[in-house]
Amino acid sequence: MNGLGVGGSQSPNLVNAANAILYAFMTITCFAGPWLTNIIGFRWTLALGSVGYPLYAAGLYHNNRTGAEWFVYFGSVMCGISAGFFWSVEGAIATGYPEAHKRGRYIATWFSFRNFGNIIGGSISLALNHKVNRRGKVGYKTYQAFIAIQCLGLIFGLFLSNPEKVQRDDGTKIEAPRGIKWREELKQMWKLLRSRQILLLTPLFWYFGWIQAYPGTYLATYFTVRSRALGSFMSAVVGTLSTWLAGMLVDIPWAKKRQTRAITTFIFIAVVNSATWIWAVYIQNEYRHTKPVLDWGNLSAFGRGFGVYMFERITFSLVENYVYWCISNLSDSPGDSIRYSSLLRGIETAGVAVGFGVQAVPTALIATASINCGLWFLSLPFSFYATVQVVRKFNELEREREAKAAGAEVGDDDSRA
């Protein structure tokens, strides 16, 4: 829905403020995700985590029809409470269930399913709003479609298999301890929070959260309703392609060593994302003076503004896949993965809450774009060192495999002797 630009609303300030509240509550419940999962399991946590989304969409629908704002805030609070649990457990499932050499593609599959919902929603929105070549809000039927789709989340979540019932293709079982007391869980979370891996990834996750307020506000400020609907659809399409590109770069053996693939993928993402944010600041500086209204009917002006938005979505998906691939290779099981996922997604949602709060003031978009660019360059060295940690773990695993192979050869020689 945010792919429509501030949820398809005419008022960026209202939805940005509501999203700030939503993500503030999500920050709390993200950190509580491992505790709830220990009690009721992955399946029920995922299903219950989806119940707030249709309430959020219903609030926007009510505002669209009546102009009332209270339901928007109510829906944001309810969505924030439930979605934090959803976010923490979905990340653990995507990073902890697959084998190490498949994790990039499994993460891409996870984001593809999420983008598939955006593609469906974007298609519906584009079909309903394709004639509205002015700025404003999307039609109310758009929200009805979103509410119907989101209500299916609870049902489909119950089809998930808990980790202890999953067997990987290589025959290994997944360890996911249950019944851990809350004091022990809190102790493990505190220990992980102070670890080098979390500290190195924190700047990148804060950046990743902070930037999410900007693209939708940019879209709502400068583009017509039908162009925003097109943006919602196309952002899901390019996001899916980008996350698969990142997943294949780290998984497909185009280079023999996974260490080489990790470093090369990081460099590729760093270069593309750096260029995108420099371009975004340049375009935004121009638009603060010209204040255009962009529509695909005027392709010469539309293409530049829409192009930078597309690249922001492309690089967002590249970074998203890569950071979760890092998590998946720093943790060894869904039990560990849900702690990594909860902590880092909690940091991400805190960044999102602050980002939307700042944008709701409102803040000049040139300032927001410049801060986004600065945060990216600030997070780069930390992200590189996090990549180095993953490479070191790969080296350790290789040494362990070589030692086991050598031990097996010695055993064979002894038996023959």
Residue ranges of predicted features:
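Extracellular/lumenal inter-transmembrane loop segments of multi-pass membrane transporters
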Residues: 3-14, 60-70, 95-102, 118-143, ...
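Membrane-interfacial loop- and helix-cap regions that link adjacent transmembrane helices
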Residues: 4, 160, 167, 172-341, ...
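Structural signature of the two symmetry-related core transmembrane helices
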Residues: 13, 44-60, 260-280
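Conserved MFS/SLC helix-loop-helix module at the cytosolic interface between two early adjacent transmembrane helices
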Residues: 28-70
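Symmetry-related core transmembrane helices of the 12-TM Major Facilitator Superfamily/SLC fold
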Residues: 111-114, 139-160, 267-274, 368-389
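Intrinsically disordered, low-complexity terminal tails of fungal membrane proteins
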Residues: 166-182, 392-417
